[in-house]
Amino acid sequence: ALLYFTEAEDELEDIFYQNVKDELLKQARKMNIHLTVYSKKDGMDAIPKDLNAFVAVGWLNRKEINRLYRICKRGVFIGTSPDEKLFDAVRPNMDSFVTQIVDYFMEKGHRTIGFIGGPDRNIDTGLPSMDIREWSFRQSASYYNCLNEDYILISDKFTVEEGYRLGKELLTKETIPTSLCV
């Protein structure tokens, strides 16, 4: 099964989730694997109790993860890692990506680096928390002594529209960075 548990707005505006879903379905077809897709809208009750295995994309809260574990213990999350004690996960190393971006900008002579990002969510509360990309950016920029809070813009969600809006907002500032990590 493919558990495609993205928020409706994420699915429409976050290219990452849509590309992951499309590629999973494409690869499954190539290998003659039938994947039944269950969405967040379908709810946890739609997932069959005799599920053999799953691939999950999107965000689940603690209650949903525990319920899923009672249904099926063989699953892999892509893009998120909600509970590494219960399920495996495949996700990009965002910490390394951001560190490499800041290193690259510094190597190219940039000393003013901006950052546009969004929040993560606490798995237990669902409340916003600092995303690993922002944390990594702050650590890397601090290391190079070039952290400038005026150049850090955080939205309440990860969407193309929000990134565009924050980029335009950054351009209205009196001084702007010479490089930007988005």
Short names for language-model regions:
Residues 46-59:
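Short, well-ordered secondary-structure micro-motifs within conserved domains or adaptor modules
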